[in-house]
């Protein structure tokens, strides 16, 4: 692993290079909007919850590199790159908390074969500058530091960053099995050590899970052999999973659980056929009542953002051109709509926003074009 501070000193000049001439529409943007990064060189740009740091993944000598900048000065604070001998390279990540950044790596498991994402993950601490591997696709022990206890294998998915617990995150581990696997297991993962503490079994084979903001409610959906979806939920204090009484005639992609733990939102298709419209729906956990929030029609690249109370704020999608539907008008949805008007015909996506909504990062692009990042 190599620190790249010396290699990316010119980065500041790149960041401050204005490219407003790239689009006549940019002149309509407020002065607080600045071109941040050139999309051909950088990706996975995000701002930390406090707004203090900006992170990105860049290519340096064909190696994926994590770079963390100070938001105020736009100077490089830290960077991480792995060399060829390490057999891994940084692929992407996100902020866990104000000072913790979790990132994934691609693993070269066989010489001459393209590196793959097997779920290997690291945590980098901006306070201590400590880099900790928290997950390895070959498996890890329940007590990682002492290499004791049962060894756990599989794919690790983050369920919740546990806003009231700075030391742990909630994760689900799905064992690697050719036939679809066994039920996933839910653990608490200690960020400083990578140690795992078992919480509960998942409700069904192949189940995917979501939590509300506090992780007080977990909702799971699992595919069945007849191509339908079954649903379950479990709240803090429950000793077992509860079936949700609903017969959904198709696949369901869960998106969010409301903060009060009463509703789960997701995308589905209830009609048959390859051109069936896609729906944003809500499902009441206790009654199983499903309501359609929005019918998108037969479209692509649907993205739904959630706001106050964990309910939909706005959605964007691609039909004959990029479109937006605002469900609850707030600062974020207003800024996104403004960007879409300024960049008519381009895909606009919000990639990150800090807790105070004072810093928002946007990507503006189109099919076949990497595009550009902007910070508002």
Where are the model-predicted features located?
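Beta-propeller folds
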Residues: 27-360, 365-371
